[in-house]
Amino acid sequence: MPFKGEIGSSLLELQYLTYLDLSLFEGSETSIPKFIGSLTNLRYLNFSGCNFIGTIPYQLGNLTRLVSLDLSFNNFDKVESLMFLSHLPALKHLEMRYTNLRQTTDWLRAINMLHSLLNLHLSGCGLSVVIPPPLSLANSSKSLAIIDFCVNEFSSSIFPWLLNFNNSLLSLNLELNQLQGQIPDTFGNMIALQHLNLAFNHLEGRIPISLGNPFSLETLDLSWNNLTGEVPNLSNFSFIKELRLPMNKLNGSLTESTDLLSNLEVMDISSNSMNGVISDIHFLTLSKLRHLDISLNSFTLNLSSYWVPPFQLDILIMSSCKQLEPHFPQWLQTQKRIIHLDISNSRISDGISDWFWELPPILMYLNLSGNLICGEVQKLPFIVDNFSAIDMSSNCFHGSKPPLPPNITVLNLSGNRFSRNASNLCSISGEYLNNLDVSDNSLSGELPDCWTNWKKLGILNLANNNFSGSIPASLALLPIEALQLRNNCFSGELPPSLSNCTGLKFLDVGENRLFGTIPAWIGENLPSLIVLRLRSNRIYGSLHLQLCHLTSLQILDLSNNSISGGIPQCLSNFTAMASNSGTVEIFDNSYSYLLDPWTTKGWYKDVPYVNIVMILWKGTEREYGNTLGLVKCIDFSSNNFSGKIPGEITRLVGLLSLNLSNNQLTGVIPHSIGHLNLLESLDLSANHLSGNAGLCGEPLPNRCPGEKVARPSINRGSENTDKRVGKREIITSGFYISMGVGFATGFWGVCCSLLLYRPWRHAYFHFLDRVGSWLYVRAVISIAKLQRML
């Protein structure tokens, strides 16, 4: 528990103090007291997380007996030198994690003078390119065992300095730096190395065959680089426990030598370009394996239905791995402690056995999406953890929607064949439910007014079903951020209670039967709204000026309604549309949980949810999801808007699409329309615009300057023009089809008659003989006459 107050000089009375731990001290933002340097008997000093500012006092160099120093997680902003460290000859443990050392230029020199140093932790310090020091500065202790330089800006120039510790280094962490080029073969000289982490860099080339001592290396993490080639034969690394190679460009197949890695606990080779067949032989001796991720490759799994694995997995991720047989993997029933199971997009076209629904109650994540799994879901696996997710989308499940586990957080049943009435939604009681997606099913009936059962529901997607009736007022009692009800049969008006959903960012009720005017409370009470889609309803009336208060709005679709009146000039208040920058992620609709907490690298798993919106783009309706944050558009088409196009709309320079077609707009196109230089789609057709003599280009008759004419202009009068038009109207695709059919009918009609009817065939060949004889006689006579004449 942190404590507060000030560090008083009364500490000086403790002249024999050897151990001082003030970590997480919540004092005022001041510098480290200089008098600490007078406690010369100190051997342990911990000032981590104390919010100290300024610089590090050089008086700390007086603590010549200090063995351990921790200054991590402070707010130093004026550290220009670390030379005080050179006066600490007994220092063995130094931690300055996430301390701002960007202005420090002598840190390497100071470190090299710590002859007793064993553990060095400088992660997140802003350290950058290192020039190899002169030999005179080389560390003389040769005892440094642990180096943690993750989250810095080191380039590959750091490698030569590391070679000073070939015989002593046990753990090296260079994750999240700027390393480039190939991994040097000299890593093979680090005979004591047990843990090597080069993840999240820009390394390329092949993985060296020699990486440390094969009899000592326990963890190897090369994930998120640009490594190519095949995974080398690791059969000699019999002591390796964790092998992480995801997010590279590795190819080739997985050699059967992996079965020799009997100590392997974690194998992650996901998101590469590997292929080949994986059979039970690959796992023959991997009895300690707990984490297996081979997803997002091109593997084919050939695992027998009767196979009994030698391991008990906690985590299994086989997404996009094709099953040699499209059956549900029966061997999964042998796994009794699995917490994360992902077999999505695996071409499984089978039903699920009853044993599957009795999985151990420790499951946190289940993903069966993107298969062809059929059958009714009697119940979902019981889940204990309060942060858990089930994704069974894009399958062939049918029947009524199954009851929910009480502690589920995310449930995605979209893209199935669930039907029945919507009344059973009231039977769901999920205190922790945050995300519910049952879109693209055949659910019907009126939505029950029982949404108070979910206290934390933030995302609700009921799109593309057959729901009817009015939108329940109790939806407004949810902390909802995204509400998708498009393409149903909802009627009535938007419930006024939705004005209480002040955190709403995504509202899509398009393609329904809603009527009434657009309520003013949308602009007044929903300031966070980013997507507003009311397309294809029965909405009428004019636009309220309060709509212009939606400064975060990026997508506004009011098309195919009966809205009238003028387009408000205040649309220029849409600040997000007036910016020419976008965000890749509109919402942070993901949740995290600790995945694989038992390994040396426990990490959090993000379970994202992508909001989908349908946008009419260049005449075609398109689906946008992952890139939705980059789209900015206004669609007012097919309404009854009148008056002029306001010039203020041209201030929305971030617009990519503007559709005002099929209205009653008049006047001229604003001269400043050219300011919309990011615009990719502009449709002003089917209006009554006038005074636009400067418009040119297809399909208008006026050609733009420098525009090439598609066909030559030939002035032969209206008669010739009509003939050419008539010819084009005759020679159509139907003309060519008729010609082909006629040729085939005539050709085979004659040939079949000659082949099948003997008298006709004999008569035909007799005719050919007579014609041939006649031609021969005529040729002989003509030649004879020609000879007489000569």
List PLM regions with ranges.
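Plant-biased, solvent-exposed loop and capping regions
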Residues: 1-790
